[in-house]
C-alpha cells in the first residue's frame, strides 16, 4: 500500500454501532452490489483492480486468482458498517493470499469532527516542515560554480569586447555611477547593482563599489566561496578592470559576470593597429587624443635563424590617433632575421631599434658570463681600468710590506738569538744545558769575555785607548797645577805590589794572545774577579755575593748584551735597564728583599729560581760544567776541571789558568772570523 503524497492516512474504524449506523444502508447496498459486479466481470484476469472513484480514497487492489472467490466488502469510508474492518483485515491477512493495494490520498473533506482535527494536524506538520526547510536554506550560503566546458577558453574572455559593449563596460567597471539613486535601488548582495554602503569598506568610493571591495555577507563568516564568486582570474585582460596584487579582477554582481562570459571571440581575430587604437584609458570615459600614441599589441613570430636581431618598434611620429578612444597597451616586439651588426642601430625611416640576438643552438651555457666580462676583440688595446690598477697597487704594496717584515724579522731573530737560546735553556734539564754550553764555542768565549773582534774593532779600540790616555794626562796635569796653586795636599793612589805583578802578567799574556786590555779598567776587573777578597772564596762558591758585586756583574753583563740585544726594560726604582722582562722581575726583588724560592735541603731562600737550582746542585755534588772539549780539527783543549755551576766555570776562564785553557778555542774563532773578512 503506497500513498502518492508520502503521508500516511488515518482510517478510523470503530465497533460502535451508533457511529456505524449514521450512513444510509441503501447506499451501502448499492455500492456493494456495484462492486460485486465489477469483481465478477474481471474474475477471468490474473489480477483484479477495484477503482473506488466515488470515494475520497482510490484503492487499487490486486490479488491472486486463487483467492478471487472470497467475498470482500468494498465500502471504505469513515462511516462504513462493521464489515469494513473485517474485510480490510481479510485483505491484509497473510492467510488470504498475497495482495497489493495502491491508495492515492486525494482529500479528506468529511463533515465529522475527528476528520477535521486530522486535517489541521497535517497542515500544522506541513507548515513546520516548510519552516525548517526555509531555515536550513537561510543558513546555507548560495554559491555559484562556474565550470569550464570543452568549448570554453580563457582566451575568449581575454580578447577585447566589441564596440557595442565597450562603452557600457568601461563606464560600469571603472567610473563611478553618476545616475545613482539610493531609494530606487536595492542594497542586497544578490541585486543587480549592489551599491551597498558599509563602514567595512573604504570611504573613497561613493556609492560603494564592490569591484574594489566586495560587501561582507551577514549569512557567512568570511566564507571563501563568496570571494571566489566575485573574483575572476584574468591574468592580463583588456577590459581595463582594476587588478589586485594577486592578479584577480573583481565583479560586483551576476550580470557583470554574464557580460564577461558571454563575450566569446576566436583566437584568430587579432586586432590590428587601427582597431586597437580605438581603446582608451577610460577612467572618466573620455581621454585627450594628443596624450596617447599609436601603440599596438602584436607578436610576430618568425623562425629562429642562425643570426637574428630583435626589432623594438618605437613610434616616432607624434600625430594623434584618428580615433577618439585609445588605450595604452604593450608595444610590438617582433623577431626578424638580419645578417650583420653588433650594436643596436636605429632606423630613422620606420623608427625601429635593431638588437642582435644570438642563436640559441650555438649559444652554450658556458658563455653566460660573457655579459659580465668584455670581449677580447673589443678591448685588445685598452689599458686596465682604475679599479684594476688600484687592486694591483694594493697587491704590490702588500708584497713590499711582506718583504720588509721578513727582513725585520730576520734581523730581530739574529739579535734575539741569545735571548731565545737562554729561554730555551730554562726549559731544558740541567744536564742538557751543561752539554749545550760545552758544545757552544761562542757561549764559552762570552763567559770568558774573550769574543774575537775584527780589525776595525781593534783599530777603534786603539783609537779610543789613545784618546783616553791623552785625556787622562791632560786632566792630571791640570789637576796638579790647580792643587799646587791652591796649596792642597793630595795623595796619589797606591797600588799594591801583588796587584801590579798580576796586571803585568796579564799584560804580557794579552800581548801573546792578541788581547787588548785597558789597565785603567782593571779596578772593575779586580772587583769582578775578587782578587782582594781571598777570604770569600767559599762564599763565592756558595753564591753569597754582596749586592754591590752583583750589581757590578749585572752591569758587565748588560754591557756585553747591549751589543746584540737592546735594553728596553728599565727599573722604576734605580733606572737600570735589562734586555729581558725576567731579569727585570728578578732585579725588582732585590729592592724589596723578596726571596720566594727556598732550598728544600737547607732552607736557604733565593730571589731567583735558577739560583736555587744551582744551590741545590751543590748539595747533590753534581758537577756538570767541564773546562775542556775538542776543536774542529780534533785537538783537545782545556784542563778538564768540573764545576757545579756555569758562573763558576766562567770565573775559572777569567783566571790565569783559565785563560790558558780557553786560548786554543779563542784562536780558532779569531782565525775563522779573519778568514771570513778577507
UniProtKB/Swiss-Prot annotation:
* The keyword DNA-binding is assigned to this record: yes
Highest taxon of source: Eukaryota
MF-aspect GO terms: cis-regulatory region sequence-specific DNA binding; DNA-binding transcription activator activity, RNA polymerase II-specific; DNA-binding transcription factor activity, RNA polymerase II-specific; RNA polymerase II cis-regulatory region sequence-specific DNA binding; sequence-specific DNA binding; zinc ion binding
UniProt KW keywords: Cytoplasm, DNA-binding, Metal-binding, Nucleus, Phosphoprotein, Repeat, Transcription, Transcription regulation, Zinc, Zinc-finger
Annotated positions of the Phosphoserine modification: 175, 245, 385
GO cellular component terms listed in the entry, alphabetical order: cytoplasm; nucleus
> What does the UniProt record say this protein does?
Involved in the regulation of calcium ion homeostasis. Binds to the calcineurin-dependent response element. Transcriptionally regulates PMC1, PMR1, PMR2A and FKS2.
Q: Which intervals carry biased composition (Polar residues)?
A: 1-21, 166-195
PTM annotation (Phosphothreonine): residues: 170
Q: State the compartments where it is located.
A: Nucleus; Cytoplasm
Tell me the protein's name. Answer: Transcriptional regulator CRZ1
Instruction: Tell me more from the record.
Output: Present with 1160 molecules/cell in log phase SD medium.
User: Main site of residence?
Assistant: nucleus
| Origin species | Saccharomyces cerevisiae (strain ATCC 204508 / S288c)
UniProt zinc finger (C2H2-type) residues? 569-591, 597-619
What does the PTM comment state? Answer: Phosphorylated. Dephosphorylated by calcineurin which leads to rapid translocation from the cytoplasm to the nucleus. Phosphorylated by the cyclin-CDK PHO80-PHO85.
InterPro entries per UniProt: Snail/Krueppel_Znf, Znf_C2H2_sf, Znf_C2H2_type
Q: Which PANTHER family match?
A: PROTEIN ESCARGOT, ZINC FINGER PROTEIN
Native organism taxonomy = Eukaryota, Fungi, Dikarya, Ascomycota, Saccharomycotina
Q: What are the BP-aspect GO terms?
A: cellular hyperosmotic salinity response; cellular response to alkaline pH; cellular response to blue light; cellular response to calcium ion; cellular response to pheromone; chitin biosynthetic process; intracellular potassium ion homeostasis; monoatomic ion homeostasis
Is the Zinc-finger keyword given for this protein? Answer: yes
Segments carrying the region annotation (Disordered) are 1-50, 159-195, 401-486
Q: Which Pfam families match?
A: zf-C2H2
The residue ranges flagged as biased composition, category Low complexity, are 34-47, 410-428, 472-486
Give start-end positions of Basic and acidic residues composition bias.
429-446, 457-467
Where in this chain does the entry annotate a coiled-coil region? none
Amino acid at each position: 500500500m503506497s500513498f502518492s503524497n508520502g503521508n500516511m492516512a488515518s482510517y478510523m474504524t470503530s465497533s460502535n454501532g451508533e457511529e456505524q449506523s449514521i450512513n444510509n444502508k441503501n447506499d451501502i447496498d448499492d455500492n456493494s452490489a456495484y462492486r460485486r459486479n465489477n469483481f465478477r466481470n474481471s474474475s477471468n484476469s490474473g489480477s483484479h483492480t477495484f477503482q473506488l472513484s466515488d470515494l475520497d480514497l482510490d484503492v487499487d487492489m490486486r490479488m491472486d486468482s486463487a483467492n478471487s472467490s472470497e467475498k470482500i466488502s468494498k465500502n471504505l469510508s469513515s462511516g462504513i458498517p462493521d464489515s469494513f474492518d473485517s474485510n480490510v483485515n481479510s485483505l491484509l491477512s497473510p492467510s488470504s493470499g498475497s495482495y497489493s493495494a495502491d491508495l492515492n490520498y486525494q482529500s479528506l473533506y468529511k463533515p465529522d469532527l475527528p476528520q477535521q482535527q486530522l486535517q489541521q494536524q497535517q497542515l500544522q506538520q506541513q507548515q513546520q516542515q516548510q519552516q525548517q526547510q526555509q531555515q536550513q536554506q537561510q543558513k546555507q550560503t548560495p554559491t555559484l560554480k562556474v565550470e569550464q566546458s570543452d568549448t570554453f577558453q580563457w582566451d575568449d574572455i581575454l580578447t577585447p569586447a566589441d564596440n557595442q559593449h565597450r562603452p557600457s563596460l568601461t563606464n560600469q567597471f571603472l567610473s563611478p555611477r553618476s545616475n545613482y539613486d539610493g531609494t530606487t535601488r536595492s542594497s542586497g548582495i544578490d541585486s543587480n547593482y549592489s551599491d551597498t554602503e558599509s563602514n567595512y569598506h573604504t570611504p573613497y568610493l561613493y556609492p560603494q563599489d564592490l569591484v574594489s571591495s566586495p560587501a561582507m555577507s551577514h549569512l557567512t563568516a568570511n566564507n571563501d566561496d563568496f570571494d571566489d564568486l566575485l573574483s575572476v582570474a584574468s591574468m592580463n585582460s583588456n577590459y581595463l578592470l582594476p587588478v589586485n596584487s594577486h592578479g584577480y579582477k573583481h565583479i560586483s554582481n551576476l550580470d557583470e559576470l554574464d557580460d564577461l562570459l558571454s563575450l566569446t571571440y576566436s583566437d584568430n581575430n587579432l586586432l590590428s593597429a587601427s582597431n586597437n587604437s580605438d581603446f582608451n584609458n577610460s577612467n572618466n570615459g573620455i581621454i585627450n587624443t594628443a596624450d596617447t600614441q599609436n601603440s599596438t599589441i602584436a607578436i610576430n613570430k618568425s623562425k629562429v635563424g642562425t643570426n637574428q636581431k630583435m626589432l623594438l618598434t618605437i613610434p616616432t611620429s607624434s600625430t594623434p590617433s584618428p580615433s577618439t578612444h585609445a588605450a595604452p597597451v604593450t608595444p610590438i616586439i617582433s623577431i626578424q632575421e638580419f645578417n650583420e651588426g653588433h650594436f643596436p642601430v636605429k632606423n630613422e625611416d620606420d623608427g625601429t631599434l635593431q638588437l642582435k640576438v644570438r642563436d640559441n643552438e650555438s649559444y652554450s651555457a658556458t658563455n653566460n658570463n660573457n655579459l659580465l666580462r668584455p670581449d677580447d676583440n673589443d678591448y685588445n688595446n685598452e689599458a686596465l681600468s682604475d679599479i684594476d690598477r688600484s687592486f694591483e697597487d694594493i697587491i704590490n704594496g702588500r708584497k713590499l710590506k711582506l718583504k720588509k717584515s721578513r727582513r725585520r724579522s730576520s734581523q730581530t731573530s739574529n739579535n734575539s738569538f741569545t735571548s731565545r737560546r737562554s729561554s730555551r735553556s730554562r726549559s731544558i734539564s740541567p744536564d742538557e744545558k751543561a752539554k749545550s754550553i760545552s758544545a757552544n764555542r761562542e757561549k764559552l768565549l762570552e763567559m770568558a769575555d774573550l769574543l774575537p773582534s775584527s780589525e776595525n774593532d781593534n783599530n777603534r779600540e786603539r783609537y779610543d785607548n789613545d784618546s783616553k790616555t791623552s785625556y787622562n794626562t791632560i786632566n792630571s796635569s791640570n789637576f796638579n797645577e790647580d792643587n799646587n796653586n791652591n796649596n792642597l795636599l793630595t795623595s796619589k793612589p797606591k797600588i799594591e805590589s801583588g796587584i801590579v805583578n798580576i796586571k803585568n802578567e796579564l799584560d804580557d799574556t794579552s800581548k801573546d794572545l792578541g788581547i787588548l786590555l785597558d789597565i785603567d779598567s782593571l779596578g772593575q776587573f779586580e772587583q769582578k774577579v775578587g782578587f782582594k777578597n781571598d777570604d770569600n772564596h767559599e762564599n763565592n762558591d756558595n753564591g753569597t755575593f754582596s749586592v754591590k758585586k752583583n750589581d757590578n756583574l749585572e752591569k758587565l753583563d748588560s754591557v756585553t748584551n747591549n751589543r746584540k740585544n737592546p735594553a728596553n726594560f728599565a727599573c722604576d726604582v734605580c733606572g737600570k735597564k735589562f734586555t729581558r722582562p725576567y731579569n727585570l722581575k728578578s732585579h725588582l726583588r732585590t729592592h724589596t728583599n723578596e726571596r720566594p724560592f727556598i732550598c728544600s735541603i737547607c732552607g736557604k731562600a733565593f730571589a731567583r729560581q735558577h739560583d736555587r737550582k744551582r744551590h741545590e746542585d751543590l748539595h747533590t755534588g753534581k758537577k756538570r760544567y767541564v773546562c775542556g772539549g775538542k776543536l774542529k780539527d780534533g785537538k783537545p783543549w782545556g784542563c778538564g776541571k768540573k764545576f757545579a755551576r756555569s758562573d763558576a766555570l766562567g770565573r775559572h776562564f777569567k783566571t790565569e789558568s783559565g785563560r790558558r785553557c780557553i786560548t786554543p778555542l779563542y784562536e780558532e774563532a779569531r782565525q775563522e772570523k779573519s778568514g771570513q773578512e778577507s
